[in-house]
């Protein structure tokens, strides 16, 4: 699969440069080592504060802080000082993985793995003759905090919002071990990809 080769080169290079979420590296390596599947853009879950010029203007939005671990209250306070123009939101998002399958049968297996691992928003669709499975959780939180550099909530409420956002992030991440276990079982069933082994050795030296 030419597409898998390109995806693996991109992944291994990003890992080498320290650009991949540390708590999801092992899972991504496992999935990509399986015959007939590979990952594209994926995230281990994140929480942060974002500034959007207007509702829905995601391409022009600006993260004031974005971390893949629980956020400290002091970090939120410091981030809000950078706010300037637009609507300010606190956002917490669960892990999300995009996995491409080589055929419909494999896509169905991946879909079932996502659901059985607790990722209830898992879906799959066909894009440019590729079966793309999106493994996604339900733990999304978006809280408006202010506008145009002005925070419109109390410090007490901000602390509460950060606590809830962190709890939702932890809940989403808590499903990753089960997902890993289920992909390990799939690997034992379908086997390891030789292309993965070769490129891993070539790029990462392991």
Curated annotation (Swiss-Prot):
Organism expressing this protein natively: Pyrococcus abyssi (strain GE5 / Orsay)
Write down the EC number: 2.1.1.282
What does it do?
A: S-adenosyl-L-methionine-dependent methyltransferase that acts as a component of the wyosine derivatives biosynthesis pathway.
Q: What is this protein called?
A: tRNA(Phe) 7-((3-amino-3-carboxypropyl)-4-demethylwyosine(37)-N(4))-methyltransferase 2
Biological processes annotated in GO:
tRNA methylation; wybutosine biosynthetic process
Reactions it catalyzes: 4-demethyl-7-[(3S)-3-amino-3-carboxypropyl]wyosine(37) in tRNA(Phe) + S-adenosyl-L-methionine = 7-[(3S)-3-amino-3-carboxypropyl]wyosine(37) in tRNA(Phe) + S-adenosyl-L-homocysteine + H(+)
Which keywords, in A-to-Z order, does the entry hold?
Methyltransferase, S-adenosyl-L-methionine, Transferase, tRNA processing
Entry-linked HAMAP family: TYW3_archaea
Similarity annotation: Belongs to the TYW3 family.
**From which domain of life does this come?**
Archaea
Return the SUPFAM superfamilies for the record: SSo0622-like
Q: Disulphide bridges in this chain?
A: none
Give yes or no: UniProt keyword Nucleotide-binding. no
Keyword tRNA processing set for record: yes
